[in-house]
Amino acid sequence: MDQQKVNLLNYNYSQLRELLIAWDEKPFRAQQLFQWIHQVGICDFAQMTNLGKVLRNKLSQLACIDLPEIVACQKSADGTHKWLLKLECGNCIETVFIPEANRGTLCVSSQVGCALNCSFCSTAKQGFNRNLSTAEIIGQVWLAARELSDNNGTHDKKITNVVMMGMGEPLLNFDNVVSAMNIMMDDLAYGLSKRRVTLSTSGVLPEMERLREVSPVALAVSLHAPTDELRNELVPINKKYPLSQLISLCKRYFKDEPRRKVTFEYVMLKGVNDQPEHASQLIKLLHNVPAKVNLIPFNPFPLTQYQRSSRETIDAFRDKLMKHGINTITRKTRGDDIDAACGQLAGEVKDKTSRSQRWQKLHFMSKTEKSTELTISSEEIA
């Protein structure tokens, strides 16, 4: 990207309006420009025909619409898409689209790598490099909409839901994530409702409080254990923000909207957190919490110490929670044949925490040996 130009993907509608006013342009031009970028999916100013030639020339001189580069695309047997996206810094992130009968969910990354080191997650094993910009977050949505479109013009409505559940802890990149989610929910952009944008967090409590105040999106909490002792092992941030504090916040998170519930994600690990006593502890923990539970069959990755719970064990765990009035579903594993399932996203990270370089080499060697065909995109998006 030209360092002298501003990337318009970093701007929400109000910011774009202020920018154009500062450039001595009419404020209404912001709506036209914003719609061209996000609704129509155009990044060539010359094609924005209702802006006027003078403004188009000015935009070409002062601004750009700079997107991540699609390095590779994989499509699962179940229809799941995974894109490997290269950033300007040279690192890569992954974005996943999961199609279903009545909706299409895009799983978006918020960081290059992750610093939280959850023991069952592939991303965590690579360490952390940096936060993504607003442009790099919303750029994932832009590119997915373009790639899923049946034509090369208007962005279709195949993406009905966005989940901030890709690489990284979204709340540790608070400002950029909230800015990107606001663009997703803007009727002049992607027009997603607040219930169709979900942020998943491991429980960064101060930022959860901030999110509650400034953004109406759905909340998912990566719980994975019913006791502090076990959660300290699986989700180390629990040592800083223990369950008592986390659950207290979740109880009042949607106090002004009593019909909304917090989703608790619970990965099922064989012999670790899947026993009847764990279900009993979870029932006690979630008492009087407006909750629904999403049981996630563990998706293995190279060098992991964990195994997936059996179907019978998962079903028994679910049934026990349901018997005690907790709305519980088991997530259907999607895209695991292309390492696109929950906990498997890896990308390519230049780790600034120096964590497990050997793990990275073995991981990517293993991915190559799977011989899953990569379709290299030759289309230039910028």
Swiss-Prot record:
Necessary cofactors: [4Fe-4S] cluster
Q: Give the chief site where it resides.
A: cytoplasm
Q: Which reaction does it catalyse?
A: adenosine(2503) in 23S rRNA + 2 reduced [2Fe-2S]-[ferredoxin] + 2 S-adenosyl-L-methionine = 2-methyladenosine(2503) in 23S rRNA + 5'-deoxyadenosine + L-methionine + 2 oxidized [2Fe-2S]-[ferredoxin] + S-adenosyl-L-homocysteine; adenosine(37) in tRNA + 2 reduced [2Fe-2S]-[ferredoxin] + 2 S-adenosyl-L-methionine = 2-methyladenosine(37) in tRNA + 5'-deoxyadenosine + L-methionine + 2 oxidized [2Fe-2S]-[ferredoxin] + S-adenosyl-L-homocysteine
Gene Ontology cellular component? cytoplasm
Q: Which InterPro entries match?
A: Aldolase_TIM, Methyltransferase_A, RlmN_N, RNA_MTrfase_RlmN, rRNA_lsu_MTrfase_RlmN/Cfr, rSAM
- Subcellular location per the Swiss-Prot or TrEMBL entry: Cytoplasm
Matching SUPFAM superfamilies, A to Z?
Radical SAM enzymes (SSF102114)
Q: What is its EC number?
A: 2.1.1.192
Catalytic-site annotation from UniProt = E94, C342
| UniProt binding sites for S-adenosyl-L-methionine | G168, E169, S200, S222, L223, H224, N299
Molecular function (Gene Ontology), one example: tRNA (adenine(37)-C2)-methyltransferase activity
Residues annotated for [4Fe-4S] cluster binding in this entry: C114, C118, C121
Q: Which residues form the signal peptide?
A: none
From the record, give the cysteines joined by S-S bonds.
C107-C342
- How is the co-factor bound, per the entry? Binds 1 [4Fe-4S] cluster. The cluster is coordinated with 3 cysteines and an exchangeable S-adenosyl-L-methionine.
- According to the entry, every stretch annotated as the Radical SAM core domain falls at 100-336
- CDD domains per record: Radical_SAM
What keywords appear on the UniProt entry? 4Fe-4S, Cytoplasm, Disulfide bond, Iron, Iron-sulfur, Metal-binding, Methyltransferase, rRNA processing, S-adenosyl-L-methionine, Transferase, tRNA processing
**Which GO BP terms apply?**
rRNA base methylation; tRNA methylation
Which HAMAP family does UniProt cross-reference here?
A: RNA_methyltr_RlmN
Q: Describe the task this protein carries out.
A: Specifically methylates position 2 of adenine 2503 in 23S rRNA and position 2 of adenine 37 in tRNAs. m2A2503 modification seems to play a crucial role in the proofreading step occurring at the peptidyl transferase center and thus would serve to optimize ribosomal fidelity.
Q: Spell out the note in the miscellaneous section.
A: Reaction proceeds by a ping-pong mechanism involving intermediate methylation of a conserved cysteine residue.
**Family note:** Belongs to the radical SAM superfamily. RlmN family.
| Name of the protein this chain belongs to | Dual-specificity RNA methyltransferase RlmN
- Gene expressing this chain: rlmN
